């Protein structure tokens, strides 16, 4: 029985150590599943998907997660700096957060100037 416990500890130790190395953004599935495309996490701008489609020709977005509730978003993503009463835009590549802004114009500018995510 003791040997079984030792074997279990030895087998589980690397797994437990590796989960500590995964960024919070990866655990929350904020990062893009597709290299070369971005995931957007938007707080406080419910109509951004329509704006992006109508106003731009940006096609480097894999997924958009839109949250209208500031309190809920702060609780779910405490590692992000969310400014209340303003739209918040967070851009993730396949590894981590690469850009954040409270300006829609700056978001569009960033996406146009950086068409290929890493």
Segments and roles (model prediction):
Residues 26-61:
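Local sequence-structure signature of Cys/Sec-based thiol-disulfide redox active-site neighborhoods
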Residues 33-34, 82-85:
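Extracellular/periplasmic catalytic domains that process cell-envelope and extracellular macromolecules
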Residues 17-20:
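C-terminal motif of bacterial Sec signal peptides marking the signal peptidase cleavage site
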Residues 69-78:
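N-terminal post-signal-peptidase region of extra-cytosolic proteins
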Residues 86-99:
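A short, hydrophobic beta-strand/beta-hairpin element that forms part of a small beta-sheet core
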Residues 1-7:
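Positively charged n-region of N-terminal signal peptides that target proteins for export
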Residues 22-24:
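Bacterial signal peptide processing site
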Residues 97-118:
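C-terminal partner/receptor-binding element of secreted or periplasmic proteins
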């Amino acid at each position: 029985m003791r040997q079984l416990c030792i074997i279990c500890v030895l087998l589980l130790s690397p797994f437990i150590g590796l989960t500590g190395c995964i960024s919070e953004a990866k655990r929350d599935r904020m990062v893009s599943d597709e290299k070369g495309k971005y995931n957007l996490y938007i707080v406080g701008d419910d109509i951004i998907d329509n704006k992006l489609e109508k106003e731009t020709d940006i096609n480097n977005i894999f997924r958009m997660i839109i949250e209208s509730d500031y309190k809920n978003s702060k609780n779910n993503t405490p590692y992000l700096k969310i400014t209340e009463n303003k739209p918040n835009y967070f851009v993730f590549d396949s590894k981590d957060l690469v850009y954040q802004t409270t300006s829609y114009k700056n978001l569009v500018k960033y996406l146009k100037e950086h068409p290929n995510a890493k």
